[in-house]
C-alpha cells in the first residue's frame, strides 16, 4: 500500500539517533572562498568544512581544462564515447535526482539534444543494470505524466494503515537482536571499542568457509590477467568503468587527467562523473501553493531545475564547466530536522550518515565511518586471516547480519533513496515567492509537517564556470541548475570526484588498509588497460 509521506506514521515515531558529528557547522550565511592551495587539506578536508574554490583565478587548483568538456567540445574530447549507449534521467516530479525514470540513448544524441536546450534529460551516474532494478523494482506502471505522486499516495482506509504499521513494527522487532555484532563494530569504528557482542553461530546456509569475491565464481588462476591482484579481464574492465564513469571511461588513457587532484591527496577516489543537462532561465508555472503537499510541490523551484535535497556518502569535489549552479547546504548536525526518507541510525564524527535497514531503506547495508560496508569489510578481514580485533566467528556474524531488507520482505515502496530529504526544495527558497499569501501558506505547511526546518542555518553558494565546491560527506545539498547569464536557455555541465570519506588527518586518513588495498587493484587495472591499448 502506498501512502503520503506527509501522513506516514513511521516518520512520526520516536527514533533514537546517535549524532556524533564533530565537524564544521553553519554559523552564518557566508561560505569560505579560497584560491590558494596552502593548508587546504587541513582547513577544509580535516575540518569537514565546505569551501568554494575560485579556480578561475588560480588555475593550479583546477584539475581540468574546463573548455574541453563544454557541450561544443566534449565529443572531440571523448570521441570513443560518441556511439556509446548511456542512461539519462528523465524529469520526474518537476525535477531530477531520484533516478525513477530513465531512458537509453547514445552520448552523441544526448549532447545534441542538450545543445538544443532539451530540459527533459539529465546525464548522471551510470548505474549497473541491477542497480536500476533496485531503484525501480516497486514502481509498477510508469506514470506517463511525470507526477510527483509516485512518492506516495493516500489510497487506503485507516484500518489498512494500522495493519501495515503493526507489520513493520513486528519485522523491526524481529531484526533488532541480530544487529548487535554489527552495531558494536560500528561503535568501535568511531570510539575505539573493540569488543563486539552476539557472536553466535552463523546461519548454516551461508558457506563462510568458502568466502570469495563475486568474480571468483568464474575465475581460476589461468584466467587472471593480473595474477598478483587476482583480477580477471571482466574485473579489470569493471574497476576502470566504475571509477571513470561512462562516458569518461576512455580518460584512463590520458595520464594527464588526475584521478586524485593534488589538493585532495591522499584521499582515495570512488567515482569520477559527468553531469549534463539543459535549462531555461525563465520562471516556471507554479503548482497550487495554497494547498501544498509533497506530491504537489515535488521538486518545483520558481526557476531552474532542482536535484532535490539530499546528501552523499562520499566527499565531493564539484567542478562547474558550463551554466550556473546554486547549492543550498545544511550541516549533518541538522540531519534529524531534514526528515530523510530513510530512518537515521547514526551520524559519524566525519559526517557520514548511516541508516536502519528496513522498508524505508530496503537495500541499505550498514557502513563504517569511511563508507566501507560492514559485511564486505568482514569478508576482507577473514580473507587475510586477521582476527586480532574480532574473532572469525564475530566477523562471520557481521556477514550474516548484512542482508538487505528487500530480501526479507515483499513490502511495496515508491519512495526516493534513503539519503533524500522529504522536505520539498521550494521550502528552502521561500524568498523567491513574491506573493505574500503563497509564502504564508508554504510557511504554515513547513511548520506543520517539517517543524524546525525554516529555522535551520543554511549556506547558499553560487558557482560560475571554473568555480568548484568541496563538500564533505553528509552535508545536505539542493542543487538548482541554470543556463549561463548570457543565455535565455542552454546546457549546464559539471564533473565531480567522489572520495572515500576520511576519518583522520593527512598522515592517516583511514582507519586501516581496506580502501588502500582496494584502490591498488584499481590502479593496477588502469595500468593494464593502458598497456593493452598502447
Residue spans for each PLM region:
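N-terminal accessory scaffold of Fe(II)-dependent oxygenases
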Residues: 2-468, 476-534
Amino acid at each position: 500500500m502506498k501512502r503520503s509521506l506527509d501522513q506516514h506514521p513511521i516518520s512520526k515515531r520516536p527514533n533514537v539517533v546517535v549524532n556524533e558529528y564533530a565537524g564544521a557547522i553553519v554559523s552564518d550565511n557566508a561560505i569560505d572562498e579560497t584560491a590558494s592551495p596552502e593548508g587546504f587539506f587541513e582547513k577544509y578536508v580535516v575540518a569537514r568544512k565546505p569551501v568554494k574554490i575560485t579556480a578561475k583565478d588560480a588555475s593550479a587548483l583546477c584539475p581540468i581544462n574546463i573548455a574541453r568538456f563544454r557541450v561544443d567540445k566534449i565529443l572531440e574530447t571523448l570521441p570513443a564515447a560518441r556511439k556509446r549507449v548511456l542512461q539519462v534521467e528523465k524529469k520526474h516530479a518537476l525535477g531530477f535526482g531520484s533516478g525513477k525514470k530513465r531512458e537509453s540513448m547514445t552520448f552523441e544524441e544526448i549532447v545534441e539534444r542538450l545543445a538544443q536546450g532539451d530540459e527533459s534529460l539529465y546525464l548522471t551516474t551510470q548505474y549497473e543494470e541491477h542497480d536500476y532494478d533496485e531503484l525501480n523494482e516497486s514502481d509498477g506502471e510508469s506514470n506517463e505524466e511525470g507526477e510527483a505522486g509516485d512518492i506516495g499516495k493516500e489510497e487506503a482506509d485507516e484500518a489498512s494503515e494500522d495493519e501495515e504499521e503493526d507489520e513493520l513494527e513486528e519485522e523491526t522487532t524481529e531484526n533488532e537482536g541480530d544487529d548487535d555484532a554489527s552495531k558494536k563494530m560500528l561503535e568501535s569504528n568511531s570510539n575505539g571499542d573493540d569488543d563486539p557482542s552476539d557472536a553466535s553461530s552463523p546461519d548454516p546456509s551461508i558457506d563462510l568457509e568458502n568466502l570469495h569475491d563475486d568474480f571468483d565464481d568464474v575465475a581460476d588462476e589461468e584466467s587472471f590477467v593480473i595474477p598478483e591482484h587476482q583480477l580477471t579481464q571482466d574485473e579489470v574492465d569493471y574497476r576502470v568503468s566504475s571509477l571513470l564513469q561512462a562516458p569518461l571511461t576512455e580518460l584512463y588513457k590520458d595520464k594527464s587527467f588526475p584521478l586524485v587532484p593534488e589538493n585532495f591527496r591522499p584521499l582515495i577516489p570512488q567515482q569520477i562523473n559527468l553531469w549534463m543537462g539543459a535549462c531555461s532561465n525563465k520562471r516556471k508555472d507554479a503548482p497550487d501553493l495554497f494547498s501544498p503537499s509533497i506530491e504537489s510541490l515535488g521538486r518545483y523551484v520558481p526557476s531552474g531545475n532542482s536535484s532535490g535535497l539530499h546528501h552523499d556518502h562520499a566527499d565531493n569535489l564539484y567542478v562547474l564547466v558550463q551554466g550556473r549552479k546554486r547549492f543550498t547546504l545544511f550541516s549533518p548536525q541538522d540531519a534529524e530536522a531534514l526528515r530523510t526518507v530513510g530512518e537515521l541510525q547514526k551520524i559519524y564524527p566525519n559526517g557520514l550518515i548511516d541508516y536502519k535497514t528496513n522498508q524505508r531503506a530496503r537495500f541499505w547495508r550498514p557502513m563504517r565511518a569511511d563508507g566501507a560496508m560492514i559485511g564486505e569489510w568482514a569478508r576482507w578481514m577473514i580473507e587475510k586471516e586477521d582476527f586480532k580485533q574480532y574473532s572469525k566467528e564475530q566477523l562471520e556474524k557481521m556477514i550474516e547480519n548484512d542482508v538487505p531488507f528487500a530480501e526479507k520482505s515483499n513490502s511495496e515502496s515508491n519512495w526516493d533513496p534513503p539519503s533524500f530529504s522529504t522536505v520539498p526544495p521550494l521550502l528552502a527558497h521561500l524568498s523567491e515567492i513574491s506573493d505574500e499569501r503563497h509564502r504564508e501558506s508554504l510557511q504554515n505547511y513547513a511548520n506543520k509537517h517539517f517543524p524546525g526546518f525554516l529555522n535551520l542555518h543554511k549556506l547558499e553558494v553560487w558557482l560560475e564556470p571554473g568555480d568548484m565546491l568541496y563538500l564533505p560527506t553528509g552535508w545536505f545539498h539542493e542543487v538548482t541548475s541554470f543556463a549561463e547569464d548570457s543565455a535565455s536557455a542552454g546546457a549546464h555541465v559539471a564533473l565531480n570526484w567522489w572520495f572515500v570519506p576520511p576519518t583522520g588527518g593527512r598522515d592517516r586518513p583511514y582507519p586501516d588498509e581496506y580502501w588502500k588495498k582496494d584502490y591498488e587493484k584499481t590502479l593496477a587495472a588502469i595500468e593494464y588497460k593502458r598497456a593493452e591499448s598502447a
